[in-house]
């Protein structure tokens, strides 16, 4: 007699939720690679961050859904042409991730570890002297299940994203950064408040209710 394990039950429940998720269905219909596109879309529509003609850096970009959304924002007349929107691109997108993903027309992709100084140097070279209007970060570490260790890993990625933004953003630029509620969250909010003139915590509707995932948006760098 076979007994179903708890993990199998959990996996089946997750799969059922995923299949029936309205954002998963919408992503499939509209040609996005992942439902995550709607998280950035909701943040952008609420705050008006992304505009044609900008330079945007997408950190933790794989599988490319956020870059797809950015691509469509920079070519709005081509929004219905599929995942890798075609047409004239009014803006620049530089994407970075440890994992590779299928190319998106007009998106410059750098594969590498954000912790690696050589990779950061390559990213800085790609940006050049123009500076960046918006940095979006969907980076998340591989979680171990050990709360203290996971909190430290999450905090490090957020701190690195803030440091990168301080180096490359225009004074009125913005940083969108994924964080998680739990140990260390209040310290990350304080970090944003120290570095940005306006700080907006947002949990998009596309973020699952059961998830501790949320986003911090910092707008306008403070003078240091």
Curated annotation (Swiss-Prot):
User: Which is a Pfam family this sequence falls into?
Assistant: FtsJ
Residues engaged in binding S-adenosyl-L-methionine: 64, 66, 97, 113, 138
Active site per the UniProt annotation: 178
Q: Write down the chemical reaction(s) this protein catalyses.
A: uridine(2552) in 23S rRNA + S-adenosyl-L-methionine = 2'-O-methyluridine(2552) in 23S rRNA + S-adenosyl-L-homocysteine + H(+)
Keywords from UniProt, A to Z, are:
Cytoplasm, Methyltransferase, rRNA processing, S-adenosyl-L-methionine, Transferase
Gene Ontology CC: cytoplasm
Q: Which GO terms describe its molecular function?
A: rRNA (uridine-2'-O-)-methyltransferase activity
What Enzyme Commission number(s) appear in the record? Answer: 2.1.1.166
Q: Where in the cell is it found?
A: Cytoplasm
Q: Per its UniProt record, what HAMAP family does this chain match?
A: RNA_methyltr_E
Record function comment: Specifically methylates the uridine in position 2552 of 23S rRNA at the 2'-O position of the ribose in the fully assembled 50S ribosomal subunit.
Family as reported in the entry's similarity comment: Belongs to the class I-like SAM-binding methyltransferase superfamily. RNA methyltransferase RlmE family.
Official protein name in the record = Ribosomal RNA large subunit methyltransferase E
Record organism: Methylibium petroleiphilum (strain ATCC BAA-1232 / LMG 22953 / PM1)
Tell me the classification of the organism that encodes this protein: Bacteria, Pseudomonadati, Pseudomonadota, Betaproteobacteria, Burkholderiales
